[in-house]
């Protein structure tokens, strides 16, 4: 009888279980394409780790399939993390406000996210991958590209993954007519009101520069007089705070040549709103008498000398508050009172005609009617001083005409608002009242989207959103300004507005035979373009914009 000895089977070498990326090849190819087009804030190391997780050989086929199921939510989260879309913190913080949007507005926002050209390009990529994968091991090329992208992060402190030669339409922060002051914040030089930008734009250097900026801003303020001189002339100050209006929006709407702009005495060409949301913008304006604080500091008590309207109240200016809306959305009115220091009663809105319905369905009143009510009310208080804060909402995204669910065309609304302001200016000129009108938009409406954000999305305060058309006009002057407006081309912000108010606060320029406009507008405080929301910061450094999301690394803002 023959005995057969059975030798135990040897386990297969681990290398036999390398299965490639399979369908995940397409996932990474889509990312590479979006990265090249500038649509991603790509994180090379995280993606390399995810790829290694997918490639790791697993002998048991069931565990291999389970890995793919686990990878689906991980891959989705990583893809979201690699985009410029709002993060979980931002979505949660804005969630209650989004819930108040009308259904029509929500559908409109969803439709804007659909990019048919991008969908077409992804479809072509899918067909190409399916076709070529019959003969080519695509995994090899995908892994090679991923390794190359990670190597790039090690070749230097700063690099860009976007195609070279992209233009920037930013402002170079040069001195112009500003005072050539030199101060220090710690051991960092601050030249011409702004920290020097000499170091290379690494994350460490940009963080250090931003800290220097805020340290320098803490020391800046405009000083109001303790009292007005006996020969001071009473006048009214009207501050008009317009939501969703930037120079980019004006240009996109084709309204750069509207007569309203020639009506101003002073126009700021590079005024930075510092944020892209209404509440923070209003707080910054109401605290205009001090330097620019960080977003977090906005919701902490400020020095009493920072509140513009309180400074005016100490000099005898009666405070007034007007809105063309109820101020309830997002707790706007509450923020204005608690953080902006505006405690005046809201002007009576009864009987005002409704011009629009807001994105949350609440009424937006006719602005000319609101302004005329203010003018009528102030006429009953002749020879007095007043300071009025007027916040208006007609240009906000999602506003629609009564009875129509579709968002009203921005240009139609902007044309109407500009016509109304122009007509109001004409009426003020006829009235002969001494009035200083200051127009400071909150932020832009993002009428034109970019590679980071679709039209209407303002989670990231990009330069096109925060560069707003601020202007000043004096009425009732004995020697009014003639000719084209005086352009302020230096980078400016709210401190410059407070400085202009201080220079005019005694009202003497209304009765002077000749006004020294050069003295009035020269050496206004400059402010470096720094814009911030809760989860995003955008700065201009060495003439180029950089963005930091959720406290991460700085990257060039894609143009």
From Swiss-Prot:
Keywords: Cell membrane, Cellulose biosynthesis, Membrane, Transmembrane, Transmembrane helix. GO terms for cellular component: plasma membrane. The keyword Cell division does not apply. The chain crosses the membrane at residues 34-54, 68-88, 113-133, 139-159. One of its GO terms (biological process) is cellulose biosynthetic process. Pfam families: CBP_BcsG. It is a multi-pass membrane protein. Disulfide bonds: none annotated. Its main location: membrane. It is found in: Cell membrane. Required for cellulose biosynthesis. This is Cellulose biosynthesis protein BcsG. It comes from Salmonella typhimurium (strain LT2 / SGSC1412 / ATCC 700720). The lineage of its organism: Bacteria, Pseudomonadati, Pseudomonadota, Gammaproteobacteria, Enterobacterales.
């Amino acid at each position: 009888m023959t005995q057969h000895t059975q030798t135990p089977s040897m386990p297969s070498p681990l290398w036999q279980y390398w299965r490639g990326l399979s369908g995940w090849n397409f996932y990474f190819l889509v990312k590479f394409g979006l990265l090249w087009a500038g649509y991603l804030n790509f994180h090379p190391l995280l993606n390399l780790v995810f790829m290694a997780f997918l490639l790791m050989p697993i002998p048991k086929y069931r565990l291999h399939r389970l890995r793919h199921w686990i990878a689906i939510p991980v891959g989705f989260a990583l893809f979201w993390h690699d985009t410029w879309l709002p993060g979980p913190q931002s979505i949660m913080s804005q969630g209650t406000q989004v819930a108040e949007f009308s259904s029509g507005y929500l559908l409109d926002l969803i439709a804007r996210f659909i990019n048919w050209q991008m969908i077409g390009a992804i479809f072509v990529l899918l067909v190409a991958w399916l076709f070529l994968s019959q003969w080519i091991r695509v995994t090899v090329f995908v892994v090679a590209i991923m390794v190359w992208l990670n190597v790039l992060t090690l070749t230097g402190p700063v690099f860009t993954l976007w195609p070279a030669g992209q233009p920037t339409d930013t402002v170079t922060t040069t001195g112009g007519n500003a005072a050539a002051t030199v101060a220090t914040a710690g051991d960092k030089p601050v030249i011409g009101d702004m920290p020097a930008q000499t170091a290379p734009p690494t994350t460490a250097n940009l963080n250090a520069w931003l800290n220097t900026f805020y340290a320098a801003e803490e020391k800046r303020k405009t000083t109001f007089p303790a009292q007005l001189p006996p020969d001071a002339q009473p006048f009214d100050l009207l501050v008009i705070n317009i939501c969703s209006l930037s120079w980019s929006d004006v240009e996109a709407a084709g309204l750069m040549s509207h007569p309203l702009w020639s009506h101003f005495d002073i126009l700021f060409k590079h005024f930075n709103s510092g944020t892209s949301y209404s509440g923070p913008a209003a707080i910054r304006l109401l605290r205009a008498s001090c330097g620019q604080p960080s977003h977090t500091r906005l919701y902490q008590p400020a020095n009493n000398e920072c509140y513009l309207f309180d400074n005016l109240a100490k000099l005898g200016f009666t405070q007034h508050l007007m809105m063309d809306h109820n101020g309830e959305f997002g707790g706007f009115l509450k923020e204005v009172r608690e953080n902006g220091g505006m405690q005046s009663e809201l002007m009576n809105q009864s009987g005002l005609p409704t011009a629009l319905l807001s994105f949350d369905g609440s009424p937006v009143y006719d602005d000319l009617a609101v302004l005329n009510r203010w003018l009528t009310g102030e006429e009953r208080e002749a020879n007095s001083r007043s300071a009025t804060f007027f916040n208006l909402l007609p240009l906000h995204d999602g506003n629609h005409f009564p009875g129509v669910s579709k968002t009203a065309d921005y240009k139609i609304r902007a044309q109407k608002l500009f016509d109304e302001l122009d007509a109001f200016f004409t009426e003020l000129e006829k009235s002969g009242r001494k009035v200083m009108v200051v127009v400071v938009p909150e932020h832009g409406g993002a009428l034109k989207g970019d590679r980071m954000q679709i039209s209407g999305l303002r989670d990231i305060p990009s330069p096109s959103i925060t560069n707003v058309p601020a202007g000043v006009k004096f009425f009732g002057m004995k020697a009014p300004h003639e000719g084209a407006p005086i352009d302020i081309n230096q980078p400016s912000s709210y401190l410059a507005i407070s400085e202009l108010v201080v220079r005019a606060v005694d009202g003497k320029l209304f009765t002077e035979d000749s006004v020294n406009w050069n003295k009035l507008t020269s050496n206004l405080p400059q402010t470096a373009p720094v814009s911030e929301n809760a989860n995003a910061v955008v700065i201009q450094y060495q003439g180029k914009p950089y963005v930091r999301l959720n406290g991460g690394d700085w990257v060039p803002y894609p143009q």
